[in-house]
């Protein structure tokens, strides 16, 4: 994966009179390195709403890490096509790989807010967990995927985070590598452990880690069950706290994402 400095060099390569704050980005459902093709939604926004015409230069992402500087050759609002002029691999990327496994909130809007903000900050994979104490036992990812795409474009990134289908917390943990198997990764669980279990701050855990592969577990409104917490620790997850405030699930997930982002800035 490209580093943030690589991404900065890519952005700097644009013409000096372009204003990155007002930069428009479109998503290509098909990109082969020579041409980018937009689906009906993106084409309509590009050609009907923003009134781009053949010959205009546009910026297109492929959703898997590359941004293309293109010239529009077909301004059909139902299926636009653009010729690739320049390629910027790793555009808007970050020098870490972050998975946030988080229990969806009872209120869908709150979890979708997390998806949006985590995407803007920098997350690679979101896993909706169904915990023993989850109030929401079913979660559909369709809308979250659309929100992630919009946030990816808004935050000037080229890679859309992967959003998994929901899985039970215990199944996710059982299939998680043990600490011995995954020495290169850092696995953290934010949980209000009782008794003598020691928790360190997430900042301390990140400072002590020299790698780039991180997974963070965030529980539901009622937190993980003791059984889930024990299973996580047995699988090599380090107990951490996110500060002294009591946080909503979605707030905790965004703070954890931000802590990782700032660690590698």
Label each region the model flagged.
Residues 1-90:
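N-terminal positively charged helical leader segments and presequences
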Residues 48-81, 170-206:
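N-terminal-biased segments
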Residues 82, 160-164, 239:
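Generic structural signal for residues in well-ordered beta-strands
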Residues 87, 131-134, 221, 244-245:
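Short, ordered loop/turn segments at secondary-structure junctions
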Residues 89-189:
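RNA substrate-binding interface of SAM-dependent RNA methyltransferases
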Residues 187-230, 237-242:
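Active-site/ligand-binding-proximal alpha/beta "capping" segment
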Residues 226-265:
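Structured adenosyl-cofactor binding patch, chiefly the S-adenosyl-L-methionine
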